[in-house]
């Protein structure tokens, strides 16, 4: 299975840099068996049935991009350097792993100041990543980070414009509650309160799970034989309550539909050992590509993904490679907007 099998031509202008307003007005491509329909996210009301269960990732994106100043005394007097930091994940010892640019301009033991309230000491460097120990913790840290940090927009958006205050709302789901992600579960960005209310009134049910999306989600696949690719690991949790709700839906013969690839990867991770959904917590590096046997997901709502990405491989596993090629060719022809701030698809195998 070759990397080129998952490539396609995407015009640059179809990469969205801002989301649709309101959220649920984004376009929705529905692929069911051999049919393709074009509509809006609000049309989910026509495609979902009473008893269907949407699985939603409730992770909260942290404003993980920080710009700091390093101060140092030299023979010529005080000197400073600007260091850009992208926080990656908290460590067991209370420090944070992060990407520091340029790393060569700061030494272990030196301090970065991000604002009057927030600073951090570089305590170690591991595999090219800095380990930062902040001066604050808990709610005080969260508040200072919210003030000093910017949203960690994906590289293909950040290359076109800097993050701004609007992104702190736009790049967050309306139900986000468990902080820890450095990328959003972007299919979920299409939901607003009116749509959730309308779906609930129709009899669609919701289950919340948590997968803290990491920066590794944007890493390119560098091997030609995709089956040898090593996935990054991300922390996730399916609570006993969530597992019971999903199991009950399956037992009743109704559909379980994850919203986003993160929710899908998590619930399939939770079913890997027994074949059925069970409570689960830990690091998952599940890699889903054609040939994968889905045990929980009956369909998937997801955005349109990058060529040659692991997420293109995932949707190809669900729908079949030829089918996905046709779906994506249709999306390009009809000028759907792609990637994190783009439009959505509902894939029903």
UniProtKB/Swiss-Prot annotation:
* Pfam families assigned to the protein according to its UniProt record, in alphabetical order: Queuosine_synth (PF02547)
Q: Which organism is it from?
A: Ruegeria sp. (strain TM1040)
Main localization is cytoplasm
Q: Cite the InterPro entries for this sequence.
A: QueA, QueA_dom1, QueA_dom2, QueA_sf
Q: Which GO terms describe its molecular function?
A: S-adenosylmethionine:tRNA ribosyltransferase-isomerase activity
Q: Which family does it belong to?
A: Belongs to the QueA family.
Spell out the protein name for this chain. S-adenosylmethionine:tRNA ribosyltransferase-isomerase
Q: How does it assemble?
A: Monomer.
Q: Name one GO biological process term.
A: queuosine biosynthetic process
SUPFAM superfamilies reported in the protein's UniProt record: QueA-like (SSF111337)
Catalytic activity annotated for this protein? 7-aminomethyl-7-carbaguanosine(34) in tRNA + S-adenosyl-L-methionine = epoxyqueuosine(34) in tRNA + adenine + L-methionine + 2 H(+)
Where in or outside the cell?
Answer: Cytoplasm
Pathway per its UniProt entry is:
tRNA modification; tRNA-queuosine biosynthesis
Give the UniProt entry's GO cellular component terms: cytoplasm
Q: What class of enzyme is it?
A: transferase
Question: What lineage, starting at the top, does this entry show?
Answer: Bacteria, Pseudomonadati, Pseudomonadota, Alphaproteobacteria, Rhodobacterales
Q: Which UniProt keywords apply?
A: Cytoplasm, Queuosine biosynthesis, S-adenosyl-L-methionine, Transferase
- What Enzyme Commission number does this protein have? 2.4.99.17
Q: What does this protein do?
A: Transfers and isomerizes the ribose moiety from AdoMet to the 7-aminomethyl group of 7-deazaguanine (preQ1-tRNA) to give epoxyqueuosine (oQ-tRNA).
